[in-house]
């Protein structure tokens, strides 16, 4: 039983109170340590290991990450990452970092710095030590006493995330643009290639780069054209050339014969003709050029496509030769009374299929007698009626081709001029013996 406080003297009262306090103290209070331990944020004291250990906020904080984000614990904190993000732990096999010692001594340096061995404050590289809160899509840049989260080139920050910039919206490319994550690529249409700035397109000269043209190549903007030499035409494939058969287009290209050749054609003439102005055929006058084989006793007569050697003296009894082409029947010869007084030899040539009627030869009287009348007729050589005589006047007449004739062919026509004088009872005749050569062609 404790003594009554009012009955005790003052000194005894103080001792009694002291004993009462000491006697009521708990045995546990006497076992408390005389110091305490404090850990930094994200860590808690582990009494067993006597060190600070990491707090797994993903387990201790309800709904630490919202929405479709997943919680990733790390030393001293946690991260909220997309569920598709991959996390590589212990990349170098070094194991977890050593336990953080108790923060018994405060950091004497300003935020973002830490003391070194010489007690100097050095910058903390938050990026290298993973002490930043930059998103996986961001780049961490260390700064003196701090750090900065930036977006890579080709990205821009929208909210907390870096989003790809669609550069194609800004028409950086001249032709086509392909957007890429963080970048873009320009492409050109066929026939163009990227210029030095990788944005503009310049024309490709396909002709200098081995375009598949068989003959001629013409470069144009963005493409090329194949062309062929004269005498060729472009094939359906647009590259190769095929010969044009000009001879098959028309039968009038050449006067005689058309010969097709690669890329061209040529005209040929028959024997006895020569080419004139590349397409026409002209008769070769062998008599004038000396390209004949007539003897001195013969006369060379040219006709279309050839020549004929005739005897210089063509007079037959009772006629005698009085000049190169004229034969005379003497009046003193009784055999000449019923014959033409003279025969003159002439030669001419015409082409085949000549248009009719056609004037081919004119007969002219060489002598005119007063009161005489001249009549002209075909005496011989016109059995088929291919010719007829049209008298022009008293002294001349025209030999007319009545029907088209085809050569090679030869006519010998005796064209007779009969001279009559009724007052003097005079009648005489003379013959022009005309040899008509019909050429084998229409030229």
UniProtKB/Swiss-Prot annotation:
Post-translational modifications: N-glycosylated; contains mostly complex-type glycans. Not O-glycosylated. Cleaved by ELANE; produces a 50-55 kDa fragment. Cleaved by MMP2 and MMP9; produces several fragments.
| Alphabetized UniProt keyword annotations | Basement membrane, Calcium, Disease variant, Disulfide bond, EGF-like domain, Extracellular matrix, Glycoprotein, Repeat, Secreted, Signal
Consequence of mutating residue 126 to K? In ARCL1B; slightly decreased protein abundance in patient dermal fibroblasts; increased transforming growth factor beta receptor signaling pathway in patient fibroblasts; strongly decreased secretion; decreased elastic fiber assembly; loss of interaction with collagen type IV trimer, FBN1 and LTBP1; decreased interaction with LOXL2; new fragments proteolyzed by ELANE; new one fragment proteolyzed by MMP2
What GO terms in the biological process aspect are recorded for it? aorta development; aorta smooth muscle tissue morphogenesis; elastic fiber assembly; negative regulation of vascular associated smooth muscle cell proliferation; positive regulation of aortic smooth muscle cell differentiation; positive regulation of collagen fibril organization; positive regulation of smooth muscle cell-matrix adhesion; regulation of collagen fibril organization
Positions bearing the site annotation: Cleavage: 87-88, 90-93
Annotated Gene Ontology MF terms? calcium ion binding; extracellular matrix structural constituent; heparin binding; protein homodimerization activity
Gene Ontology, cellular component aspect: basement membrane; collagen-containing extracellular matrix; elastic fiber; extracellular exosome; extracellular matrix; extracellular region; extracellular vesicle; microfibril
Variant or mutagenesis effect after changing residue 397 to T:
In ARCL1B; increased N-glycosylation; introduced an extra O-glycosylation site; does not affect secretion; decreased elastic fiber assembly; decreased interaction with collagen type IV trimer, FBN1, ELN, LTBP1, LOXL1 and LOXL2; new fragments proteolyzed by ELANE
Provide the effect of residue 57 to K: In ARCL1B; does not affect secretion; decreased elastic fiber assembly; loss of interaction with collagen type IV trimer, FBN1, highly glycosylated form of LOX and LTBP1; Does not affect interaction with LOX when LOX is non-glycosylated; proteolyzed by PLG
Where, per UniProt, does this protein localize?
Secreted, Extracellular space, Extracellular matrix; Secreted, Extracellular space, Extracellular matrix, Basement membrane
Signal peptide range in chain numbering? 1-23
InterPro entries this protein is in? Answer: cEGF, EGF-like_Ca-bd_dom, EGF-like_CS, EGF-like_dom, EGF-type_Asp/Asn_hydroxyl_site, EGF_Ca-bd_CS, Fibulin_C, Growth_fac_rcpt_cys_sf
One Pfam family of this chain: Fibulin_C
Q: Which PROSITE patterns match?
A: ASX_HYDROXYL, EGF_2, EGF_3, EGF_CA
**Glycan attachment residues as annotated in the record:** 198, 394
Q: Which Gene3D superfamilies match?
A: Laminin (2.10.25.10)
Q: Which residues form the EGF-like domain?
A: 36-81, 123-163, 164-202, 203-242, 243-282, 283-328
Q: List the disulfide bonds.
A: 58-121, 65-80, 71-109, 127-140, 134-149, 151-162, 168-177, 173-186, 188-201, 207-217, 213-226, 228-241, 247-258, 254-267, 269-281, 287-300, 294-309, 315-327
Q: How does it assemble?
A: Homodimer; disulfide-linked. Multimer; allows heparin binding. Monomer. Interacts with FBN1 (via N-terminal domain); this interaction inhibits EFEMP2 binding to LOX and ELN. Interacts with LOX (via propeptide); this interaction is strong and facilitates formation of ternary complexes with ELN during elastic fiber assembly; this interaction limits interaction of EFEMP2 with FBLN5. Interacts with PITX2. Interacts with ELN with moderate affinity; this interaction regulates ELN self-assembly maturation stage. Interacts with FBLN5 with moderate affinity.
Query: Family assignment?
Result: Belongs to the fibulin family.
- What the protein does? Plays a crucial role in elastic fiber formation in tissue, and in the formation of ultrastructural connections between elastic laminae and smooth muscle cells in the aorta, therefore participates in terminal differentiation and maturation of smooth muscle cell (SMC) and in the mechanical properties and wall integrity maintenance of the aorta. In addition, is involved in the control of collagen fibril assembly in tissue throught proteolytic activation of LOX leading to cross- linking of collagen and elastin.
**What's the disease link here?**
Cutis laxa, autosomal recessive, 1B: A connective tissue disorder characterized by loose, hyperextensible skin with decreased resilience and elasticity leading to a premature aged appearance. Face, hands, feet, joints, and torso may be differentially affected. The clinical spectrum of autosomal recessive cutis laxa is highly heterogeneous with respect to organ involvement and severity. ARCL1B features include emphysema, lethal pulmonary artery occlusion, aortic aneurysm, cardiopulmonary insufficiency, birth fractures, arachnodactyly, and fragility of blood vessels.
Provide the protein name.
Answer: EGF-containing fibulin-like extracellular matrix protein 2
Q: What is the lineage of its organism?
A: Eukaryota, Metazoa, Chordata, Craniata, Vertebrata
């Amino acid at each position: 039983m404790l003594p009554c406080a009012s009955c005790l003297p003052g000194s005894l009262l103080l001792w009694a109170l002291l004993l009462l306090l000491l006697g009521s103290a708990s045995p546990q209070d006497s076992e408390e340590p005389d110091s305490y331990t404090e850990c930094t944020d994200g860590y808690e004291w582990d009494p067993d290991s006597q060190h600070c250990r990491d707090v797994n906020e993903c387990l201790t904080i309800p709904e630490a990450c919202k929405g479709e984000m997943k919680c990733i614990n790390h030393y001293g904190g946690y991260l909220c990452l997309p569920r598709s993000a991959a996390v590589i732990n212990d990349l170098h096999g070094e194991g977890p970092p050593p336990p953080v010692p108790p923060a018994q001594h405060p950091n004497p340096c300003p935020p973002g710095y830490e003391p070194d061995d010489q007690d100097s404050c050095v910058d903390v590289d938050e990026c290298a030590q993973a002490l930043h809160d930059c998103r996986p899509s961001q780049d961490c840049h260390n700064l003196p006493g701090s750090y900065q989260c930036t977006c890579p080139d080709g990205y821009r920050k929208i909210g907390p995330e870096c989003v790809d910039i669609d550069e194609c919206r800004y028409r950086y490319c001249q032709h086509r643009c392909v957007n890429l994550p963080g970048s873009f690529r320009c492409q050109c249409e066929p026939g163009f290639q990227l210029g030095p700035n990788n944005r503009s397109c310049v024309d490709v000269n396909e002709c200098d780069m081995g375009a598949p043209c068989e003959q001629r190549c013409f470069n144009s903007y963005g493409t090329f054209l194949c062309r062929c030499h004269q005498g060729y035409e472009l094939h359906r494939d647009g590259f190769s050339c095929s010969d044009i058969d000009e001879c098959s287009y028309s039968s009038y290209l050449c006067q005689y014969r058309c010969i097709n050749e690669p890329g061209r054609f040529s005209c040929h003439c028959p024997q006895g003709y020569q080419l004139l102005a590349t397409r026409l055929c002209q008769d070769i006058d062998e008599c004038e050029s000396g390209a004949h084989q007539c003897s001195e006793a013969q006369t060379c007569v040219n006709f279309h496509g050839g020549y004929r050697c005739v005897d210089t003296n063509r007079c037959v009894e009772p006629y005698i030769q009085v000049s190169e082409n004229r034969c005379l029947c003497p009046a003193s010869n009784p055999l000449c009374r019923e014959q033409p007084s003279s025969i003159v030899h002439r030669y001419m040539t015409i082409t085949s299929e000549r248009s009719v009627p056609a004037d081919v030869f004119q007969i002219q009287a060489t002598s005119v007698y007063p009161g005489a009348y001249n009549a002209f007729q075909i005496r011989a050589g016109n059995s088929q009626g291919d010719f007829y005589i049209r008298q022009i006047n008293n002294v001349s007449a025209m030999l007319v081709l009545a029907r088209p004739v085809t050569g090679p062919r030869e006519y010998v026509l005796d064209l007779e001029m009969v001279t009559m004088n009724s007052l003097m009872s005079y009648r005489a005749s003379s013959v022009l013996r005309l040899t008509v050569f019909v050429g084998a062609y229409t030229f």
